[in-house]
Amino acid sequence: MSKLQISVAMGDYDRNRALYDGRVQIDGCDPVYMLLSPEEMFFRAMRSRDFDITELSFSSYLVKHSRGECPYIAVPVFLSRAFRHTSIYVRKDRIKIPQDLRGKRIGIPEYQLTAIVWARAILQDDHGIAPEDVTWVRGGIDTPGRPEKIKLDLPPGVKIDSAPEGTTISELLDRGEIDGFIAPRAPSGAALNNPQVGWLFDDPTATAKDYYRRTGIFPIMHVVGIRKELAQQHRWLPAAVMKAFGESKTRALELLSDTSATKVTLPFVEEQLKAARETLGADFWSYGVAPNRRTLEAFTRHHFAQGLSARHMAIDELFDPSTYESYSI
């Protein structure tokens, strides 16, 4: 019997490596893997539906899924997760504490990006800064004129300006024409070396650890989506995809735990791994709904409150039904 030929777009992460190097197979499938940047993957997936299986922005997925317009159905495989305290940059010459952002101008590449949804949630829940309290300035990080991937219908109190033509938000931050900058990537160009530009939180790692201890939330950035028609035609496929991605992640964690020779080109990996386990627990990068319900509930609540979801999505309608339970031996 021939295998199902599929295209798979994903990032080049250690947790995916056993898939694309062939050590882990997706049962019943003959995949063609494409390792792409998030920006390219998400743009092509949402604009032209280029892939059978693809990594997706959790926020973009939720916008489309809540409207019944998404060509993909997600499985609870969370390829990217991050505490977004390091995503908030400010002009240190005028912003000393989070509350100083009230009434100010903050640059963003797109309003609906997952990282920015989480950053706004942090600012609102922990510091009382609502999305309506600032003016959002939308533009490219490195290149001028970045468009919003998805048409949005935002609440009337949200104020969004476009960066001046030919200008990036990194340049605006460097010149002091905006007060803050929130993005999945650091500001580029001269802003990186500007002594007046820095993180809002002086010790973002300590702040993030405190956030996790208080909330139990490890923010989810990306999910895996399967073309709806494929998932409907081959009902075994969502579970097979989830199983394969889970096995690949397990291989990556096994290698990371092998300290006989460092697998990552970075010092202090063993200490960081120990710190992650002490703070987040042994299964610190879990897939599946049950161990991530608190994080999923927080995100869907904020996503709807920020005017991005058409309705407040229930957790049991986010993913393919076959992926909410798993077998055990």
Model-derived features: positions:
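Pocket-lining segment of extracytoplasmic ligand-binding domains
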Residues: 147-257
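Short, glycine-/small- and polar/acidic-enriched structural segments
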Residues: 7, 14-145
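Short helix-initiation/N-cap motifs at beta->coil->alpha
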Residues: 33-44, 96, 134-174, 314-324
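Basic/polar N-terminal segments that are highly enriched at the extreme N-terminus
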Residues: 1-4
